[in-house]
Amino acid sequence: MNASRIAAAGASTLTRRIIPCLDVTAGRVVKGVNFVNLTDAGDPVEIARRYNEQGADELTFLDITATSDGHDLILPIIEQVASQVFIPLTVGGGVRQVSDVQRLLNAGADKISINSAAVANPELVRAAADYHGSQCIVVAIDARRSSAEGEPARWEVFTHGGRKATGLDAVAWARRMAAYGAGEILLTSMDRDGTKSGFDLELTRAVSDAVPVPVIASGGVGNLQHLADGVTTGRASAVLAASIFHFGQHTVRECKQYMAERGIAVRLT
C-alpha cells in the first residue's frame, strides 16, 4: 500500500471521511438511477484529479460492468490515476481471485473492493485478507429492501451490478464478511442510488451497529444534510457520493465545511 496516501487520509479513526465515487464503464465515468439509466459524467483521470485538489479523503473506482460483462480489470485507468493523485484509491469490479487483488495493488490501488466474487466464493475474502491484510480489503454490498411495509426491516444482497438477487440478508452478510477479514464495508442502497433522496439510514445504521469495522454509506446523496445524516443518524464512518460532485452541485470542500460546522470531525485542508 502507498503509505503517503494512507497518511494523507488522516490518522484519527474518529475523523469522518468524504469519498467521491467514480462508477466506470467503457473508460468513462457514468452515473445512473437505481443502477440503470446511465449518464456520462466525464474522463476518470480528470475527475479524479479534481477531487484530489478539492481535498477528498479517498476515491473509490468501481467498474460497474466488469463482472456482468466478464471483461478484464481496469488497470490502465488505475495506473494513470495513481500517478496523479495522492489520496487512497479503492478499486472494485471484476475481482475474481487473489491474483486480481495483487494486480490492482501493483497498478496503484490502495484498497480493493470485492462484491460479486465474495458471494460466489466467500473464502476469497478470507484468503485476500490473510495475504494482503484486512486494511486492503473492502467488501461492497449492494442491498435492496425486501420487507413489506409494517414488517421488520430486511434487505437483500444483489450482485452483478445489481442484476442478480442472492437471497442473502444484508446485515447478516456484512457481519459474516467482517468475520472473514473485510476491513471495511461499502454499503450501497439500491433503492436510493441516484435518487438524491438521502441514504437509507435504517439500513446504514443496522449494518454499522452489526459490524466491528468501518461502514461507508452509499446511495442517495442529494444535498449536504444527507452527508451529515449518514454519520450522525446512520452511524457510518465515511460517506460516499457521486452525482452532487460529478455535476457540480457541491465541491468536496463545501461538504466538509458543512459537516465541520455541525460538529462532525472531518479533515480540513
Swiss-Prot record:
Biological processes per GO annotation: L-histidine biosynthetic process
Pathway: Amino-acid biosynthesis; L-histidine biosynthesis; L-histidine from 5-phospho-alpha-D-ribose 1-diphosphate: step 5/9
Family as reported in the entry's similarity comment: Belongs to the HisA/HisF family.
Catalytic activity: 5-[(5-phospho-1-deoxy-D-ribulos-1-ylimino)methylamino]-1-(5-phospho-beta-D-ribosyl)imidazole-4-carboxamide + L-glutamine = D-erythro-1-(imidazol-4-yl)glycerol 3-phosphate + 5-amino-1-(5-phospho-beta-D-ribosyl)imidazole-4-carboxamide + L-glutamate + H(+)
Pfam families hit by this protein: His_biosynth (PF00977)
InterPro entries hit by this protein: Aldolase_TIM, His_biosynth, HisF, IGPS_HisA/HisF, RibuloseP-bd_barrel
Subunit field text: Heterodimer of HisH and HisF.
Claim: DNA damage is one of the keywords in the record: no
Residues of the active site: D23, D142
GO molecular function, one term: lyase activity
Gene3D superfamilies tied to this protein: Aldolase class I (3.20.20.70)
Function (record text): IGPS catalyzes the conversion of PRFAR and glutamine to IGP, AICAR and glutamate. The HisF subunit catalyzes the cyclization activity that produces IGP and AICAR from PRFAR using the ammonia provided by the HisH subunit.
Entry keyword set: Amino-acid biosynthesis, Cytoplasm, Histidine biosynthesis, Lyase
UniProt xrefs under PANTHER family: IMIDAZOLE GLYCEROL PHOSPHATE SYNTHASE HISHF (PTHR21235:SF2), IMIDAZOLE GLYCEROL PHOSPHATE SYNTHASE SUBUNIT HISF/H IGP SYNTHASE SUBUNIT HISF/H (PTHR21235)
SUPFAM superfamilies, per the entry: Ribulose-phoshate binding barrel
Listed name of the protein: Imidazole glycerol phosphate synthase subunit HisF
A single Gene Ontology CC term: cytoplasm
Subcellular localization: Cytoplasm
Keyword Lyase: yes
UniProt EC number: 4.3.2.10
HAMAP family assigned: HisF (MF_01013)
